[in-house]
């Protein structure tokens, strides 16, 4: 996952992390764990993030999925 790209999209939408978490229905502590790599976003969370940030399919793939298949 590209944490910096996701953070950039949040900023582009004029949101604080707290406001974003509220809009996406994710607790701040859960968001922090996922951003640090301790756990992964679920499909449902990714769907809510896509909606909250109005992400295109390309942007979604760029943020959440690896460039290479291993």
For every predicted segment, state its role.
Residues 14-33:
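Short alpha-helical DNA-recognition segment
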Residues 8-13, 51, 57-70:
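Short, charged recognition helix plus adjacent turn
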